[in-house]
Amino acid sequence: MQWAVGRRWLWVALFLAAVAVLTQIVWLWLGTQNFVFQREEIAQLARQYAGLDHELAFSKLIVELRRLHPVHVLPDEELQWVFVNAGGWMGAMCLLHASLSEYVLLFGTALGSPRHSGRYWAEISDTIISGTFHQWREGTTKSEVFYPGETVVHGPGEATAVEWGPNTWMVEYGRGVIPSTLGFALADTVFSTQDFLTLFYTLRVYARALQLELTTYLFGQDP
């Protein structure tokens, strides 16, 4: 009996050690990456259009991103607004760029929505174009409110409660192990809403973004 208990603890210790080693490898890998975008670059671009009608702001932002990074933003025919169900909330996203280590997307909701933020092996920042963003950080007893032009940063491994007012739209930039975020992003779609068409749209646009980055890496770079 004692031997069985000891074996269980041994497996737990080995599992935790493997997780620690994997985490270290992941962060070392991220340190070797040449990122296309910078968090502050995306935030500054979004601030230029904060307060405008969100559709006008998004169209201007896309034009500017294509000017700055012409081979790293999906073409118009690949842009699509896709529902996202995660953490008990529902929003919509339009993916502009994605790789294994970063992404840029447009995100928001036409209806107010409280939710759990999720925990990620990635840093995620949202610069607000319109509406309000309430954030309640883990370990605190008060929430913060963010308005158009402000940027909300969600660090790796952090968890918060968030709530958006109606017609809240933002520009989001993520950097880290991007495939690790898909579990949270798709869990409700698979196990709750069972909206498999949305699941297909999400995976398809991510695959196309990866294909664009691979093609750019192999055959061409930013001028």
UniProtKB/Swiss-Prot annotation:
Its main location: nucleus. Keywords: Cell junction, Cell membrane, Cell projection, Cytoplasmic vesicle, Endoplasmic reticulum, Lipid droplet, Lipid transport, Membrane, Nucleus, Postsynaptic cell membrane, Receptor, Synapse, Transmembrane, Transmembrane helix, Transport. The keyword ATP-binding does not apply. Ubiquitously expressed with higher expression in liver, kidney and steroid-producing tissues such as placenta, ovary and adrenal gland. It comes from the Eukaryota. Residues 177-223 are annotated as: C-terminal hydrophobic region. One of its GO terms (biological process) is regulation of neuron apoptotic process. Residues 2-8 are annotated as: Targeting to endoplasmic reticulum-associated lipid droplets. InterPro entries: ERG2_sigma1_rcpt-like. Residues 99-106 are annotated as: Important for ligand-binding. It is a single-pass membrane protein. The record marks D126, E172 as: Important for ligand binding. Changing Y103F: Alters pentazocine and NE-100-binding. GO terms for cellular component: anchoring junction; cytoplasmic vesicle; endoplasmic reticulum membrane; growth cone; lipid droplet; membrane; nuclear inner membrane; nuclear outer membrane. Belongs to the ERG2 family. The C-terminal helices form a flat, hydrophobic surface that is probably tightly associated with the cytosolic surface of the endoplasmic reticulum membrane. This is Sigma non-opioid intracellular receptor 1.
